[in-house]
Amino acid sequence: MSLIGKLFGTGGKGAKGPSPQEAIQKLRDTEEMLAKKQEFLEKKIEQELVTAKKHGTKNKRAALQALKRKKRYEKQLAQIDGTLSTIEFQREALENANTNTEVLKNMGFAAKAMKAAHDNMDIEKVDELMQDIADQQELAQEISDAISKPVGFGEDFDEDELMAELEELEQEELDKNLLEVQGPETVPLPNVPAASLPAKPVKKKQEEDDDDMRELENWATA
């Protein structure tokens, strides 16, 4: 017979033992009862001590009887203290066992649920599924790359030639901007001689005037 069976009077192989919750509650009730007994004995010890002091000098026989009763109460109190310690230890152990039982029960329930969830799963099928997902992702990436590439629609150009032409245009634009910043180029004019041009000879001019006058006279007399 188990200790719990001996304590609570359950016996026989066919007898059903108390549940952990019932046993824990009974132990708590026992602790409460013993605590009240402790309080009662402590009061009795105080009373007997008062009685012994009261008859200490007047009635030694009554004082001795009071001290004997006090000793018996103290012995009972010590026994109850030990019993309470044992019951408290047993209750804590039973509570821990009950907690462990509940934890294991819940873990077992979770394990069964996990097993049921995995019953229709095959690791090979999972691997195949993950491989299919990876293949589809790779295909999707290839399609995205193909779509993002520019299409020439039959136009085939030399990239190097186009780049060279672009650089030439850029250089022309830079030169043009540079000229606009510096202003129009100043064209140097020919040097002007410092000395004055030689004047026409006065004599030659007079001769020309005389010739003109003679021609005029000849025309008038003709």
From Swiss-Prot:
Main location group: cytoplasm
GO cellular component, one term: ESCRT III complex
Localization: Cytoplasm, Cytosol; Late endosome membrane; Midbody
Top-level taxonomic group: Eukaryota
Signal peptide region: none
Pfam families, A to Z: Snf7 (PF03357)
Keywords on record: Coiled coil, Cytoplasm, Endosome, Membrane, Protein transport, Transport
Sequence segments annotated as region (Disordered): 1-21, 177-222
Coiled coil segments of this chain: 21-182
One record GO biological process: vesicle budding from membrane
Known function: Probable core component of the endosomal sorting required for transport complex III (ESCRT-III) which is involved in multivesicular bodies (MVBs) formation and sorting of endosomal cargo proteins into MVBs. MVBs contain intraluminal vesicles (ILVs) that are generated by invagination and scission from the limiting membrane of the endosome and mostly are delivered to lysosomes enabling degradation of membrane proteins, such as stimulated growth factor receptors, lysosomal enzymes and lipids.
UniProt subunit comment: Probable core component of the endosomal sorting required for transport complex III (ESCRT-III). ESCRT-III components are thought to multimerize to form a flat lattice on the perimeter membrane of the endosome.
Family: Belongs to the SNF7 family.
Protein name: Charged multivesicular body protein 4b
Native species: Xenopus laevis
Taxonomic lineage from the root: Eukaryota, Metazoa, Chordata, Craniata, Vertebrata
